[in-house]
Amino acid sequence: MLVTLVFTMALTSIGFAQTKQVPKTLSYEKAVELAIKNSLDIKQIDRKLQKIETTNKELDKTSERLSIPGIDYPEKEDDWNQLLYSLEKEDKEKKLNEFSARYTKRMLEDTIRNLFHSIESSVLDLQDYDQQIQLKQKELQIAKVRYSVGKISRYDYDSIKTSLEGMKRTKEQKRLELQKQKLELNKYLRLNNLDEYTLVSIPYQYQPITLTDAELNSHAVRASHTNMDVVAKENGISLQQLLIDQNLVLGNRKIQQEDVYIANTENLKLKEDIREGVKREYANLKLTEERIELLLYRKEVMKQELQNDMVRLKYGKISKFSIEEKKMQLSELERQYTESVKEYELAKIHFQNLYVSGSNL
């Protein structure tokens, strides 16, 4: 099933600006481009890479000076050791920052995708609440007449009225939640007025994922090796070991080596936690698949019931209001199904992305 929707942020019923001009559209891809462009983290990484480039040029000059033939002095060996360490350090720092840039971009993609989904869901929820409130208002009008002629009790009438008031309060909460989501999205995009834009929904096609135990284990291992925290820790451990090997450490060398062993053990534990996190994500995906299949079954049953009720309505066996209620129930199942498919595909993208898979421990 291909779920393709366009959800507007120009609906006055939920507090969006209304304009006679042709609305501007904002795609997910464009939003990611803006988020990356505005990212202070990525700008900071770029500055670090520029600094590394400058440092490497200075190290090249030092290397040339130490390589001049005929020059020899007692400290030269220490200078070479320090130079080798500095070259290795800058090389690792460069690779780490390049990795960090890729990681940050992937995380931004993940964040913007989730915010697009959350905003769309909130817009659809508000539209759904509008329909439910309209139906409940009709129900209240009917109940008022029935109460006036003694067909229902005051308690029944008040219950319907209270339910309607509760729906209105929930709708207001949803509206405030939507405003919060919009502010969060614009924190990354920095547009002058996000309400001027129509967000183009990301299409999702429901495709269940199936992995063998070996494939799942392999994915978990790869994810544990590409996690940002793991890579950063390994980088630090490697540099500390190099300091020890080059006799550049201060203090007790044995204690320094023990610190390296401890850090290695901690990193192994972190990798194990990430692998377990990946497996939990996969288990949750399979549970969501079951929920989607159940919703699909309930949808088909509800459609059949609605067809039967249409026949009963024709012969006066049920009221038109009952048909409207059943249509609302079917609409709610359709919404739940669509929402579950999107949530599944979002979770699947997160799972398949080695940079972030298993990171929500």
Task: Map each language-model feature to its residues.
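Short flexible linkers and secondary-structure junctions
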Residues: A17-L115, I237-Q241
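Sec/SRP-type N-terminal targeting helices
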Residues: K43-R47, E75-K105, D130, Y155, ...
